[in-house]
Amino acid sequence: MSNTSLPSSFDSHPEFFQETKWQKFTRRIKEEPLIPIGYAATSYALWRAYKSMKAGDSIELNRMFRARIYGHAFTLFAIVAGGIYYGNERRQRKEFEKALQEKSNQQKRDSWLRELEIRDKEDKDWRQRHAAIEAAAKEAEKKG
């Protein structure tokens, strides 16, 4: 069976979605607060380097370029250290999210199948009514 989801009128229901992008973003910032600090330090150093370049202050410009490199190093260290520290937790979270996704896909599939069964039953009922009407019309034609 392919990984593509089956179409259904239940796709718009919110119970099929667990964590929004904003919730994930805030959770990740809370888990690893040093990464945004590193981004901010790097951005600040770049901004100060730009201001120094415009002012013609080459000494401050070189200091800020070094600060930018330190900011990058700090950010990279925070990413690697956070990856090591939260590695096991992330694996467990991925397994949990995969289980939720499988459950959600199964619910969608079951809902879709129920919907198809209802449509099939309605179609069969309509065909039976149509056949009964045709039979009654033929009977009336024979008598008439």
UniProtKB/Swiss-Prot annotation:
Function: Cytochrome c oxidase subunit which plays a role in assembly of respiratory supercomplexes.
Subunit (UniProt): Associates with the respiratory chain complex III/complex IV supercomplex.
Protein family (similarity comment): Belongs to the RCF1 family.
Positions of transmembrane segments: 33-50, 69-88
InterPro entries: Hypoxia_induced_domain, RCF1
PROSITE patterns: HIG1
Name of the molecule in the record: Respiratory supercomplex factor 1, mitochondrial
Keywords (A to Z) from UniProt: Coiled coil, Membrane, Mitochondrion, Transmembrane, Transmembrane helix
Organism: Paracoccidioides brasiliensis (strain Pb18)
CC annotations in GO: mitochondrial membrane
HIG1 domain mapped to chain residues: 6-97
GO BP term (any one): mitochondrial respirasome assembly
